[in-house]
């Protein structure tokens, strides 16, 4: 059984436009959002996996907005919709760097979206995690700040 290429219920709350414009953009898009990546996954690994479904136009790695280091997501854009649909079917839910990755439609990359939206610079989901996840920087950022010794006052 094939994975769905239908739109998920997630919508980018920062989309510039109406809900119907966003829906139209998602239905016509050749761009995918890829989540749950390890902070150590490289652009080359992503290209190798996603190019099995077609010609990849561009990969934009998600970055911590302050440190400019990878923060666990990226955008993959294909030249044609049918190849993006193939990636939705065959890559979503597969394992990359020992993590199950999530692939979803994106309305199209806009400059600035490559940066994490969390208060500490990474993804919001990594701010509040209480579990230890070595592939995503250890404990959640807010918890790490609470348990890390303060070395500024020495």
Swiss-Prot record:
Entry annotated with the keyword Nucleus: yes
Gene3D superfamilies: 3.30.70.330
Keyword Nucleus set for record: yes
Binding site for mRNA: 10, 33, 102-106, 113-117, 123-124
CDD domains per UniProt: RRM_NCBP2 (cd12240)
Domain RRM: 30-108
Keywords: mRNA processing, mRNA splicing, Nucleus, RNA-binding, RNA-mediated gene silencing
Main location: nucleus
GO BP annotation list: mRNA cis splicing, via spliceosome; mRNA splicing, via spliceosome; negative regulation of viral genome replication; primary miRNA processing; regulatory ncRNA-mediated post-transcriptional gene silencing; siRNA processing
A GO-annotated cellular component: spliceosomal complex
Cellular compartment(s): Nucleus
SMART domains: RRM
Disulfides per UniProt: none
Entry GO MF terms: mRNA binding; RNA cap binding
Alphabetical list of InterPro entries matching this protein: NCBP2 (IPR027157), NCBP2_RRM (IPR034148), Nucleotide-bd_a/b_plait_sf (IPR012677), RBD_domain_sf (IPR035979), RRM_dom (IPR000504)
Family: Belongs to the RRM NCBP2 family.
Function: Component of the cap-binding complex (CBC), which binds co-transcriptionally to the 5' cap of pre-mRNAs and is involved in various processes such as pre-mRNA splicing and RNA-mediated gene silencing (RNAi). The CBC complex is involved in miRNA-mediated RNA interference via its interaction with Ars2 and is required for primary microRNAs (miRNAs) processing. Also involved in innate immunity via the short interfering RNAs (siRNAs) processing machinery by restricting the viral RNA production.
Subunit comment: Component of the nuclear cap-binding complex (CBC), a heterodimer composed of Cbp80 and Cbp20 that interacts with m7GpppG-capped RNA. Interacts with Ars2.
Name this protein carries in UniProt: Nuclear cap-binding protein subunit 2
């Amino acid at each position: 059984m094939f994975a769905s290429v239908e739109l998920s219920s997630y919508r980018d709350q920062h989309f510039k436009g109406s809900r119907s414009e966003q829906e139209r953009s998602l239905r016509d898009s050749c761009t995918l959002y890829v989540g749950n990546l390890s902070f150590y996954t490289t652009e080359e690994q992503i290209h190798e996996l996603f190019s099995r479904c077609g010609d990849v136009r561009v990969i934009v790695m998600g970055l911590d907005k302050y440190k400019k280091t990878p923060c666990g997501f990226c955008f993959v854009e294909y030249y044609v919709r049918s190849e993006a649909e193939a990636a939705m079917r065959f890559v979503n839910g597969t394992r990359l760097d020992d993590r199950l990755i999530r692939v979803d439609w994106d309305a199209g990359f806009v400059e600035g979206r490559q940066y994490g939206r969390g208060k500490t610079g990474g993804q919001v989901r990594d701010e509040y995690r209480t579990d230890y996840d070595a592939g995503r920087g250890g404990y959640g950022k807010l918890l790490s700040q609470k348990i890390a010794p303060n070395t500024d006052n020495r």
